[in-house]
Swiss-Prot record:
The keyword Lipid metabolism does not apply. Belongs to the cytidylate kinase family. Type 1 subfamily. It is found in: Cytoplasm. The keyword GTP-binding does not apply. Keywords: ATP-binding, Cytoplasm, Kinase, Nucleotide-binding, Transferase. One of its GO terms (biological process) is pyrimidine nucleotide metabolic process. It comes from the Bacteria. Its main location: cytoplasm. PANTHER family: CYTIDYLATE KINASE (PTHR21299:SF2), CYTIDYLATE KINASE/PANTOATE-BETA-ALANINE LIGASE (PTHR21299). One of its GO terms (molecular function) is ATP binding. This is Cytidylate kinase. It catalyses: CMP + ATP = CDP + ADP; dCMP + ATP = dCDP + ADP. InterPro entries: Cytidylate_kin (IPR003136), Cytidylate_kinase_dom (IPR011994), P-loop_NTPase (IPR027417).
Amino acid sequence: MGMVITIDGPAASGKSSVSRELARRLGWQWVSTGAFYRGLAFAALQLQIDLDDVSTLASLTHDPVWSVKMDDERTRVFFKDQDVTDQIAHEDVGNFASKVSHYPEVRKALLDAQRNCSAGPQGLVAEGRDCGTVVFPTAEAKVYLTANSEHRAARRAAELGLDHEDMVKAQQQRDLQDSTRKVAPMAVPEDALVVDTTALNLNQVVDAVVEYVKNKI
């Protein structure tokens, strides 16, 4: 495997946009590890599997009824051979995904799948909430993106067409769940480059990350 760069951070901090553009500039592979949890959550919701049915959820991680595939533009999720990538962005899917991520049995199964993502000869850009701390703890370069909660809520509300105040509350709850879960809580990786994206545009953030990566190569 080539070099691995991890990009972590809370929801709507800019992880996906930055990771995708960074991978494009470098000519590397890009994977969103969160897509695995959202894909599982979407499948569970479609199959009406109860959130508390841990054994069935763990078994579903290996069920071919859903799958994750990477291409040059995004990490795609398929359910019954249909591309549902846009649908997994919905808040109900994200909330379900955050809750099932607390289960060690589910995390272990999906962790194996995430680590099996193939990197090209140059490298892999891996984006998520625990890439630098859990999925790829020995990655050569680690980045943590953050932004104030109001700014993140505004981004997410505009993206999904939802009420801003409702989104603020939803994201605060999601951040609490992700940062306090007993298994692999969201945290800033040791020695990571921390970038506050609140007042920066996409190119400014990517430029900063590229300079950081150059010093690691």
